[in-house]
């Protein structure tokens, strides 16, 4: 059994040529796919928890039902990839390209996406993830004025409502009621 403490693959696929490979329902937990060429491969039903896929190219790859929870997918190319019913909870997808990706039923809850990419996905996002029960549009924050107003987790200064304000002497502002301290 490979991997750290026998609980994952921890396999090294960095810069590997995986074009048109078939790895259905496999465990790639904590594996390294940095800069791997995964074009037109089939990874449907596979688990990638905690894996590294930064700069990987997965053009037209099939990730139907794959679990990408807590995965680093920074600068990944996912053009025309099939992410139907995939779980991308807490994944980091900054500077990744998902143009034309099929995301029906995908769960992006707490995932970090660039705002332009998120807005592009919201134009056609649909479905509900059968594993988590979360609606794809809800997980992306589509149409949520409050969430859009504060940005995304990738913008920490804008990702939460403003902190409670104190006046210049360190006391609560009684006019706005923004502080509970006495």
Question: How would you describe each model-predicted region?
Answer:
Residues 1-182:
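Tandem repeat scaffolds
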């Amino acid at each position: 059994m490979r991997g750290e403490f026998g609980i994952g693959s921890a396999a090294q696929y960095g810069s590997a040529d995986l074009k048109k490979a078939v790895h259905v329902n496999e465990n790639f937990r904590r594996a390294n796919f940095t800069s791997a060429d995964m074009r037109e491969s089939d990874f449907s039903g596979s688990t990638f928890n905690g894996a590294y896929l930064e700069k990987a190219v997965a053009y037209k790859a099939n990730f139907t039902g794959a679990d990408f929870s807590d995965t680093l997918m920074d600068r990944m190319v996912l053009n025309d990839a099939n992410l139907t019913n995939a779980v991308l909870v807490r994944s980091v997808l900054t500077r990744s390209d998902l143009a034309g990706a099929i995301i029906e039923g995908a769960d992006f809850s707490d995932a970090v996406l660039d705002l332009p990419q998120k807005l592009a996905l919201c134009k056609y996002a649909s479905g509900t993830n059968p594993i988590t029960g979360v609606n794809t549009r809800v997980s992306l924050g589509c149409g949520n004025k409050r969430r859009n107003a504060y940005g995304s987790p990738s913008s920490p200064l804008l990702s939460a409502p403003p902190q409670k304000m104190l006046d210049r002497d360190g006391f609560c502002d009684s006019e706005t009621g923004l502080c509970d301290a006495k």
